[in-house]
Amino acid sequence: MNWFFKKKKEELEHTNDLHKEYIELSYEQPQVLFKHSHKCGTSTWVLREFKQMLDSVDCSFDFVLINVFDKRSLSNELARVLEIPHQSPQVLVLKNGKVVDHASHGDILQLNVTQLLC
């Protein structure tokens, strides 16, 4: 599993390019996009539990943590392009250029990540 947290500010200037990058990378391996609010207790709790779930997955994928306060434009652009209304916390699983599943809040912990990613 590859973990991507924050990219350098200059790499994030072109939000359109960044969301396209994640979609393109999903053709190589699944992309797990986690929209997180560090100011929300529920988001922090779900992120911690979800990371534990991902640790048990035995296949290759990228995990991208998107801080919705710092990267609001990226979050909004993903919602627009993927046609999934913005939530936080929210997980979007991309494979082959498409969203294969998504969930928000406590429903994130109900995702069958092994089936989705492997």
Regions found by a protein language model. Name each.
Residues 55-61, 112-113:
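Short cysteine/histidine-rich metal-coordination sites, predominantly Zn2+-binding motifs
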Residues 35, 59-75:
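Thiol-based oxidoreductase modules, predominantly thioredoxin-like and allied folds used
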Residues 1-30:
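N-terminal leader/targeting and pre-domain segments
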Residues 82-85:
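Short loop/turn motifs at secondary-structure junctions and domain boundaries
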Residues 87, 92-118:
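Non-catalytic, surface beta->alpha helical segment in thiol-disulfide oxidoreductase systems
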Residues 76-80:
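Short, basic/aromatic recognition patches
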Residues 21-57:
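Local sequence-structure signature of Cys/Sec-based thiol-disulfide redox active-site neighborhoods
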